[in-house]
Every structure is written in C-alpha cells, then in structure tokens.
C-alpha cells in the first residue's frame, strides 16, 4: 500500500528519497563495448543470439520487412500515429533556432555571426523488452528531422524470430527514419558510437533504455554526444481537495506500471483526498494488465505527502524536480510561474500525463532523478550545434589591436599579444 506522510512530521530524507540502482553493470558494459569495437558485426550477431535468442542473417531491416510490418498494423493505429506525429511536429517546429549575423554602424568593419548546424547523423535507441514504445520513435525522430539531420538511424532489439515489432516499424515509417538495425542493449549503443561494418557511426545518441543501455551511454559520452542518462519513470501530482481521487489514482498508476523502480508521488493539502487516493489505488491495481509491476512500484517507491497548503506543495515539487508534474488544481496557470524544476508540466484536471506520452506534442523524453534542476526535455536543440564566425577589416583591427595586445600581456601570453599587432607593423 502507498505510504501517506505528513510534511513536517518526517525527515526530508524520507520525503525526498529516490530509488538508487542496486545492480552494478559498469564492468559488464565495458566488456560489451570493447567487444563491439574490436569485432564489429560479429559481436552484434553473437549478442543477438545470446540476449534476444535471435539467429540473424542480417542486421539491417529491409524495405520488404518494413512494408510487411506496416501492412500488418491496424490502419486505425497508423492514423493515430500520423495524428500524433502532426502534433509533435507542430510543437517542435517552434523550437528551431536561426543563425544570426551582426554587422552594424556601432562597430564598422566588423562582422560577427552564429551558424546553427544540424549534426550529420543521429542514432535513436528504441527499447524492446516488456513493452513496445512506438511513441519513443516519434518523439525522438521527429525533432531530429526538423533539425535537419542528414541521416537518422534507429536501433532496436529483435524478437526471437529475428523480427522487429511491427508497430515500431510503422512508427519509424511515419517519422521518416532512414535506416533501422536489429540490435539492442549496450551493444547497440556501442555500435552507434563506434560504428561497425553495418551500423554507421553517429554523432548523437538519444533514447531510453535499461540500466545497461544507460551505462553504455555514459561510457561512450565524449566519443559521441548523448541526450541524457535516464533513470526510472517518475510522476508527481500536486492536487487540491477538489480533485477526483479516481482520476489522481489512475494518473499515478500510469507511471507505476512502467517499471518496478518507477516513482509515483502525490502532494496534496487534503488528508481526505490522500486517503481516498490510497483506497482508489488499491481498487485499481488488480484491474491492470501490469498489476505486478505497478504493485511493486507503489509499495516500494510510491508516497502521498500531505502539505499544509498548495504553496508548500509547490515547494516540495520543486525540491523533488520530477520528470512529470501534474497540477490538478483550480486555476493551474496561477501556479505556473512558481514551478522551477520539472521535466514536463500538465495543467489542470483534464490533462493526464498520458497525453504527453503519446499525443499532445511536447516531447516525452524528459530528465529524471532530479536532473530537471539543470536539464531539459529532448528538443530540436539536441540535434544541432552552433559555430560562430568573426571578420575584421584592416581599419577595424587598427582600432582594437593594441587593446588586445595589452589584454594578452596581462595573461602572460606574449605570442597572443604579438599576433594582435604584427599586421599593423607591416606598414611601419
């Protein structure tokens, strides 16, 4: 049963406790990465047979496989994927940053600018395992495409027949992914980071995964850019006494069913609501297909915190910095400016977090484990880099060269100082 805690009556360590990983996978992942670097495709084939029970003849998904998979998917689901993709594009197109140039009368003879350039190739990791996530395909690929990435590559584990889940491939076609490979786990991350005979090396790796995938991303960071190292799913709901307990419980369970390590937290100013939500959770869990997972998540990591008022509840939310934050209150926009740390915010009583997972438009790849204090959701920005340029005429250089020389000497860098003025000496 979910714990009910009164704010001010328990230690902060209990209020703000987070799940810590108990499995140490660094050495195993390091060995996998080394093997893929040294043996390339051969290692990927072996890992597919070992971990996925799949004996593959090819790592790449062919167009024929794509056509067959898409044809097998319910047309209604294809239509829903296309609607969701439209919403995701609409939101992310607003994130596009433009290059700029500064060339004005204040600094005649000087041109400065910034170029926004997409990475050449992005790699998307899409999990397999206990659930298929076509939503991840859309959320990760569409921003990359909007950014202008030349080639978007997807990796995902096959089933034991050597096939990729058809709904994953359908989403890949809707999103416009260029190439798909049947490989998962740490070995897939290694292949994207270093390249193999089949899998091309990428510049950016994005997408969620298990502890092995997260550790692999951590280890290859620096060789390649990554989006984030994601932890277990989280939801925090701030709800007042007027909230519907059945709705709040359903929203908490929507995250609890993800993973036994997932965290579902309610912060409310109403003990009556706290007790009603606790009862609703107990009533709803047996109705879930993933009841065992949700039960473990709620019992081990779930909590209800009863605060003195909603402003204190907001303070608690900021301290926890959750991945998903729901504001189930009257006039939610009155509280929006007070929210400083959250991956994504869902406003009002009619905005369940599931809208954001699938359909609304904002990205669902979000910072977890409190990293919303300094990190952001996946966006178009993740797939671009910025470079800058400077141009000076001779006349413009003459105006500043001796200031630059003096500055450089203060740092003891005499070659810098000399470089600033040597051109002016040519005419002397």
How would you name each of these model-derived features?
Residues 1-120:
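N-terminal Rossmann-like NAD(P)+-binding subdomain of aldehyde/semialdehyde dehydrogenases
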Residues 100, 105-170:
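Conserved small-residue-rich beta-alpha loop and adjacent elements
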Residues 139-150, 173-175, 193-199, 217-219, ...:
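Alpha-helix C-terminal capping segments
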Residues 150-160, 264-270, 277, 348:
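Short internal beta-strands
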Residues 176-254, 258-263:
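Conserved NAD(P)+-binding/catalytic subdomain of aldehyde/semialdehyde dehydrogenases
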Residues 228-300, 304:
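A conserved active-site cap/scaffold subdomain adjacent to cofactor or substrate pockets
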Residues 318-428:
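C-terminal core of ALDH-fold dehydrogenases
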